[in-house]
Design a protein with these regions (language model features):
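Aromatic- and acid-rich polysaccharide-binding/catalytic face
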Residues: 1, 65-68, 72-74, 115, ...
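Active-site clefts of carbohydrate-active enzymes
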Residues: 27-31, 78-81, 113-124, 152-158, ...
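Active-site groove signature of glycoside hydrolases
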Residues: 55-88, 112-117, 156
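Aromatic-lined carbohydrate-recognition surfaces of secreted/lumenal glycan-active proteins
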Residues: 71-74, 92-133, 179
Length: 179
């Protein structure tokens, strides 16, 4: 368990707040840090040692802290757009394994992942992005029911220069895309 996760839980207890803890594994560009001793050239979620270590870490965190909220991966669609379909599905399967391990230790923990909204929509010209919209990957997570929520980061300035340019219904499509 990373030291900063322990520190966050200690600070939350000290100040009486309910923390939202997340375990990320890549840069905002989708470049992961998943290599291991046994597979140093495999920087993907097909790396068996990495999968085992990540699953064990989140399970240990759930056993020790029983968090109310726990998200695995931040802006995970950045991984989708930079990796193969097989590598993406390996992440989804690991997420589901982690979900089961977390729920076994802490049944009430809300477990979810986070996507980057502008990238998901196929926007981001000011960030240099040219990715097509990829809403379908949400269904990869919803298919087996092993996810409690979805989170999104949003930076409209990646596409729009002024607030006035942002469509009034900018966030409305989320409800239709999540059904």
């Amino acid at each position: 368990i990373p030291t900063n996760a322990h520190q966050a839980m200690q600070a939350a207890a000290q100040f009486g707040v309910k923390p939202v803890i997340g375990f990320g594994w890549s840069s905002g560009d989708g470049i992961p840090d998943l290599a291991s001793t046994s597979e140093p050239s495999n920087n993907s979620f097909t790396n068996m040692e990495t999968r085992q270590n990540f699953r064990a870490m989140v399970a240990a965190f759930a056993v020790q802290y029983h968090p109310a909220y726990l998200f695995l991966g931040n802006e995970t669609n950045s991984y989708f757009v930079t990796h193969t379909q097989a590598e993406w599905l390996a992440w989804v399967s690991l997420f589901e394994e982690c979900y089961d391990a977390i729920k076994a230790a802490s049944p009430t923990t809300l477990v979810y992942t986070v996507f980057q909204l502008e990238k998901m929509k196929g926007l981001g010209k000011h960030a240099g992005w040219t990715y097509p919209a990829h809403w379908q990957i949400i269904q990869d997570h919803l298919r087996n029911g092993k996810i409690d929520a979805l989170g999104f980061t949003s930076y409209p300035y990646f596409e729009y220069q002024t607030v006035a340019q942002i469509p009034a219904d900018y966030f409305n499509m989320l409800t239709s895309k999540l059904q």
